[in-house]
Amino acid sequence: MAKGPFHFKSFSVEQDGAAMKVGMDGMVLGSWTDVNGVDLAIDIGAGNGYVGLMLLQRMAQGTKVYGVELEHDAAQQCIENLSNQPFAGRTAEGWSGPVQRFHLEKPELVGMADLIVSNPPFYKNKPKSQDNARNLARHDDTLTMGDLAQSAHRLLKPGGRLCTIWPSDRLEEWESWSSGIGFDACRTVHIKTMRHLPEKRFLSEWRKQPCAPESNVQETLILEGSATLDFTDQYLAFIQPYLRGT
């Protein structure tokens, strides 16, 4: 993705200050997540804030999104992008700092969120670059699975949902952490970037109370056919409200 502003159909985000730009993982998470009945959503590891804005676009009037970001430059960009959101009757606010302290700075939000989303720094024990900001955005040294699950459980109200995206090789680890904290699995979507390739990512939705007996629903999402940008109808159905040219 380009380093300059990224223009969605209904909003734009500045991203020159964020180590990680608008990308497919966040696009999939933001378009897939259900916002029905959501009054308060929190995006953990928000980067430049675009996932939160994707949610806000579909949320009702009177609702709010918070974006929580640790890395300083990305957090400032998140604060700017969320404060400039164009959706009437809705509000958005960025917050700079570690999510492990968010509940201390915002105690009024403990147990109040209907939805938490996260496209977290999900690489564990992988080679790092010389760019510290990029390492913060990609590696889990400062936000482990346990940190994320515990923070989300603290901030969500009973019945609140946690939606995330992870590499496929961390599925069992995430299931162990989430169920151990007290979440119940509702939906899992296994993502293939192309039909002929193995699964690369998975989306998961967990609820802070038991899900329906027929859960956990297992699905597969294929992003592209046999060529780059040959988007499948399945993927286009998700991204058409957002991505120009679709």
Feature locations, PLM:
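General small-molecule cofactor/ligand-binding pocket signal
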Residues: 14, 93-95, 186-189
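Conserved Class I SAM-dependent methyltransferase catalytic core
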Residues: 18, 142-199
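SAM/dcSAM-binding transferase cores
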Residues: 198-246
